[in-house]
């Protein structure tokens, strides 16, 4: 069984930064395990600029920012495996992984770093009534479809949730020729940066409805429209405030859930 001082699960920005820092502290035997086909994680689909101002003192796109870390990891000869899924981590830090080239392999680690990022909450967690037609995506999924896969989810879009990715996707869909009808936010304030509200919504005359949510989804095979309504302090819809929008695409931007949040851990007073 091959051994490593540190095994890092996840090759996104956090995993790369952890590996680079560990290497600079004198730890030689490091392995990054990434299930995707490239390092960089979520940064690869964030093609807008605004990254790198604090770390590199210049404005970069997401892929450019990721590439800086990938180059540093390469210069430090940090080992990594792509297309590799972690199946199990035992109490004695034996990491079991699987990929097409090696099959199932076990590695012994002295320390394991979990840097697996976050996952968007699905529609089912948002309690939106209606059928399940095609055309409903998380904002992150739509971002990957447009920026990496080269597919347009639809032509008439409503976005629920005003986090930064939701705001950025409103602008991105507009760039690609879609009509973004509105952005609705259940909270009385936006979850995104003021800069993104101005640059992604105000500059393109996209309305932002605070204290509003989607209360109905229309369509059987394909989404045909949504109904949004104002909500009170209890987040319940206020009768008489309903607005109908024809659309073929609904993007959901909700609170992210950390991957591995339920991993059991035990505090050690010696570390």
Placement of each model-derived feature along the sequence:
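Residues forming the flavin
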Residues: 1-262
